[in-house]
């Protein structure tokens, strides 16, 4: 008999223990989930962690391929797959393993299987169809907890097809005698109608019954379903109006007595239910005077009786104020709501203060006087340590600025700008600029305010603000001397603020000669220079060149341009020679743009005829437009009607002299919502080609002659140029050409399909009778009056039986309150229903990218008939 050496025996056992056996019948020993997590956390480098994960993934794949029916091993595999999913690793190879786990009759296995299915699967994967049988069986289980698992999984992963297959089973469970199952079934039905709105009729009657339930959970679920259904299909609001009296009675009971001690929070009776009822009543009462009258008394009672010392009470009060605003209640209720929100601002809880500031921003247009009474409290929030509260308080403060308080409010905002963090410095500077442009009492105050902004936040100022500042100075001759002296002194103190340096260079280049012999008396201000020589002016520009970073080439270019202009403004030949040497010294600069400017300006200075023409003083431009940035809808409507009337009167005058469509019409006034103008209207209001801007005059000296611009003719004459069959002598028949264009003879009311992130998407459907094509105009609107949308992108998909043509967006960005649109054309079988899947990407100014998907099938059914 052969004996084994003890050392060899030790090695053999060690190999088996570590799982190195190759026996096909024995599974290698797997580490537990706990040890896997410890191994990942113990990794000292990213590479080591990645290696650990790859080894474990390979082991899981191997176990799955061997096809063991051991449920314990399967649970361990799926648990590790969930951890890999949390780490962002691929887990597609384990999807079938999750479904196999559902075949077990044990609750433990089903719980893990459904959890994995909800996380590792989504409604777009084909493997989801294999889940149908398991869901159908578990929905009929006698164990209410297994039914609950199936309902939860169904609501999270079911797509439109699976929703249609099992919708009847869900409807039956809504009437189940177990409140636990009934509650989950209604919430599941909510998910169903969000994905397939056509199935709402299966659940409406059952929801009516459940709205009378005495169970807290069932009633909450029924209210959530009703709110969502009314938002998806507003025609259902009238269907639920009969429930208003019972809901009003319930909330009166909740606000005056203990309705259910089980759900009390801080002596507040069931605050979650109160909030949900108020949300639903705000929908029911919007267009129903009877419900509105009953709710006015109810809202006053809720606002009076609710304890505001508890956070739960504040939640109810907040929803009550939102309901007051949604219903457009009378002034007394709105003032009461404003007072409640102002009281929130004194709360210690940051969340309470934040939502109060957000809500006050919505009510300031309708109840400005009431909000103005709490101005000091709002301004105090600017000093909060929380930057998000500072940001909301800053936005609200700008809404409070008007002609009467502009000096006080801007002074407070400037004080805030001096101490604010870099995170908010740019937006603060922008807000101050906007309110100053709108309400400045005089030009000197306007200049002084923007100059202080440039001193505090010159590195955060936008190009548009810099342009407005220079335009303000150039358009006001009385500011020229004052501005050049102030900017010269500011430049001597600080050259670190880019906007301040650029504006000082431009102004010194244009009006630098005024520094030599000022006519104004500046003796009272000790910070201003009393005497300046030509060499002092050139010295300050050289000092800036020597102190700025080498990468800030834009400052050098502005400085070279200022020196070039100064050579014509200052009379000394020695100064002109010095300037020429400084400019020519940059001909070997690392930056090609600086090189080019150096050579160009050197050639200009050495050509007396050319320099005399180019370096003439810039003509005064038009002053910056004085527009109010924060107007309510009524003010905008009045302003636009006024503009349309002026344009119409202008067109009528042009008709009298035979010019039906003016080719060189300048607008008498700019509409408030300029972004909403169509491309045709923008063309018809284009400035005359014979009247160039002053900046074009300067640039034209270095450019080649431009081709003569053709006048903008009417739309008919534009189409006439496309008639290739007509002879040259034959007059074009514009009417016949226009008649060949397909006409949209039938239109439909607009439909709002998306309202998130302060962006709304409205679809305006119409039908071309001649081509049987559905034409849908998608209109985006930026509801935020403060921040712009940097980029917006829309992706659209239709069913396979239909064809889609989509035109690009008119503009991919939206100013505050602005709009943009694009046109969709859908062609398909006659009588088919147009259904759209919309994917909307929104990038806000200073914010992150948000991506939302909307499935919409409620378009008119006769679009393709």
From Swiss-Prot:
One of its GO terms (cellular component) is endosome. It is found in: Cytoplasmic vesicle, Clathrin-coated vesicle membrane; Golgi apparatus. Residues 665-690 are annotated as: Disordered. It comes from the Eukaryota. Its main location: membrane. GO terms for molecular function: clathrin adaptor activity; clathrin binding. Residues 746-860 form the GAE domain. It is a peripheral membrane protein. InterPro entries: Adaptor_Complx_Large_Subunit, AP1_complex_gsu, ARM-like, ARM-type_fold, Clathrin/coatomer_adapt-like_N, Clathrin_a/b/g-adaptin_app_Ig, Clathrin_app_Ig-like_sf, GAE_dom. One of its GO terms (biological process) is Golgi to vacuole transport. Keywords: Cytoplasmic vesicle, Golgi apparatus, Membrane, Protein transport, Transport. Residues 675-690 have a biased composition (Polar residues). Pfam families: Adaptin_N, Alpha_adaptinC2. PANTHER family: ADAPTIN, ALPHA/GAMMA/EPSILON. Belongs to the adaptor complexes large subunit family. Adaptins are components of the adaptor complexes which link clathrin to receptors in coated vesicles. Clathrin-associated protein complexes are believed to interact with the cytoplasmic tails of membrane proteins, leading to their selection and concentration. The AP-1 complex interacts directly with clathrin. Adaptor protein complex 1 (AP-1) is a heterotetramer composed of two large adaptins (gamma-type subunit apl4 and beta-type subunit apl2), a medium adaptin (mu-type subunit apm1) and a small adaptin (sigma-type subunit aps1). AP-1 interacts with clathrin. This is AP-1 complex subunit gamma-1. The lineage of its organism: Eukaryota, Fungi, Dikarya, Ascomycota, Taphrinomycotina.
């Amino acid at each position: 008999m052969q004996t084994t050496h003890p050392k060899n025996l030790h090695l053999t056992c060690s190999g088996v223990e570590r799982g190195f056996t190759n026996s096909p019948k024995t599974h290698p020993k797997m580490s537990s989930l706990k040890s896997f997590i410890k191994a990942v956390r113990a990794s000292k480098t990213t590479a080591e962690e990645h290696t650990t994960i790859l080894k474990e993934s390979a082991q899981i794949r191997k176990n799955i391929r061997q096809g063991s029916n051991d449920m314990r091993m399967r649970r361990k595999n799926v648990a590790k797959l969930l951890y890999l999913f949390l780490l962002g690793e691929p887990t597609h190879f384990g999807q079938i393993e999750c479904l196999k786990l559902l075949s077990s009759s044990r609750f433990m296995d089903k719980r893990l299987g459904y959890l994995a299915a909800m996380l590792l699967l989504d409604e777009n994967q084909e493997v989801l169809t294999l889940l149908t049988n398991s869901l159908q069986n578990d929905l009929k289980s006698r164990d209410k907890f297994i039914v609950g698992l199936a309902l939860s999984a169904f609501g999270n992963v079911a797509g439109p097809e699976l929703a249609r297959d099992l919708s009847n089973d869900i409807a039956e469970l809504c009437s189940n005698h177990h409140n636990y199952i009934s509650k989950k079934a209604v919430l599941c039905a909510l998910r169903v109608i969000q994905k397939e709105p056509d199935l709402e009729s299966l659940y409406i009657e059952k929801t009516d019954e459940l709205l009378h339930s005495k169970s807290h959970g069932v009633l909450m679920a029924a209210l959530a379903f009703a709110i969502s259904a009314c938002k998806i299909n507003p025609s259902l609001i009238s269907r639920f109006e009969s429930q208003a009296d019972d809901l009003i009675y319930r909330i009166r009971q909740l606000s005056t007595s203990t309705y259910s001690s089980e759900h009390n929070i801080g002596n507040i009776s069931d605050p979650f239910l109160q909030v949900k009822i108020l949300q639903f009543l705000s929908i029911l009462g919007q267009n129903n005077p009877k419900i509105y009258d009953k709710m006015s008394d109810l809202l006053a009672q809720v606002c009076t009786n609710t304890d505001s010392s508890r956070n739960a009470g504040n939640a109810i009060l907040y929803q009550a104020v939102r309901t007051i605003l949604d219903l457009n209640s009378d002034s007394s209720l709105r003032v009461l709501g404003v007072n409640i929100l102002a009281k929130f601002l004194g709360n210690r809880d940051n969340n309470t203060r934040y939502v109060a500031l957000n809500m006050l921003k919505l009510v300031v247009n309708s109840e400005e006087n009431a909000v103005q009474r709490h101005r000091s409290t709002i301004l105090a929030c600017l000093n909060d340590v929380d930057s998000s509260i500072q940001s909301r308080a800053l936005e609200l403060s700008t809404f409070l600025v008007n002609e009467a308080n502009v000096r006080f409010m801007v002074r407070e905002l400037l004080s805030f700008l001096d101490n604010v963090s870099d995170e908010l410095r740019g937006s603060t500077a922008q807000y101050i600029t906007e309110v100053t442009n709108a309400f400045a009492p005089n030009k000197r105050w306007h200049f002084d305010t923007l100059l202080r902004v440039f001193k505090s936040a010159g590195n955060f100022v936008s190009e548009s603000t810099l342009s407005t500042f220079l335009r303000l100075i150039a358009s006001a001759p009385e500011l020229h001397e004052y501005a050049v002296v102030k900017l010269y002194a500011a430049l001597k103190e600080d050259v670190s603020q880019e906007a301040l340096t650029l504006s000082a260079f431009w102004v010194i280049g244009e009006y630098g000669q005024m520094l030599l012999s000022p006519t104004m008396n500046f003796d009272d201000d000790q910070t201003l220079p009393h005497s300046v020589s030509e060499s002092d002016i050139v010295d300050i520009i050289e000092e800036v060149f020597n102190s700025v970073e080498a990468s800030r080439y834009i400052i050098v270019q502005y400085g070279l341009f200022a020196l070039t202009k100064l050579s014509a403004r200052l009379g000394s030949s020695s100064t002109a020679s010095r300037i020429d040497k400084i400019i020519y010294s940059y001909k070997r600069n690392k930056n090609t743009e600086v090189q080019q400017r150096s050579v160009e300006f050197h050639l200009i200075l050495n050509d007396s005829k050319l320099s005399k023409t180019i370096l003439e003083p810039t003509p005064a431009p038009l002053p910056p437009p004085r527009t109010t940035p924060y107007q309510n809808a009524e003010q905008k409507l009045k302003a636009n009607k006024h503009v349309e009337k002026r344009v119409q009167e202008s067109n009528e005058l042009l008709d009298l002299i035979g010019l039906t469509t003016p080719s060189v019409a300048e607008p008498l006034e700019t509409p408030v919502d300029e972004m909403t103008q169509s491309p045709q209207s923008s063309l018809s209001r284009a400035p005359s080609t014979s009247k160039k801007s002053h900046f074009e005059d300067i640039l034209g000296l270095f450019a080649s002659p431009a081709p003569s611009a053709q006048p903008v003719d009417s739309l008919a004459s534009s189409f006439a140029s496309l008639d290739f069959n007509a002879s040259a002598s034959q007059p074009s028949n514009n009417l016949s050409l226009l008649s060949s264009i397909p006409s949209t003879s039938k239109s439909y009311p607009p439909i709002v399909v998306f309202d998130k992130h302060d962006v709304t998407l409205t679809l305006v459907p119409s039908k071309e009778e001649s081509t049987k094509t559905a034409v849908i105009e998608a209109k985006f609107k930026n509801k935020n009056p403060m921040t712009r949308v940097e980029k917006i992108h829309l992706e659209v998909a239709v069913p396979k039986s239909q064809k889609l043509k989509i035109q690009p967006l008119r503009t991919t960005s939206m100013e505050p309150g602005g709009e943009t649109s694009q046109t969709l054309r859908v062609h398909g079988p006659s009588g088919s229903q147009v259904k759209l899947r919309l994917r909307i990407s929104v990038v806000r100014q200073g914010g992150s990218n948000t991506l939302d998907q909307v499935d919409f099938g409620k378009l008119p059914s006769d679009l393709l008939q």
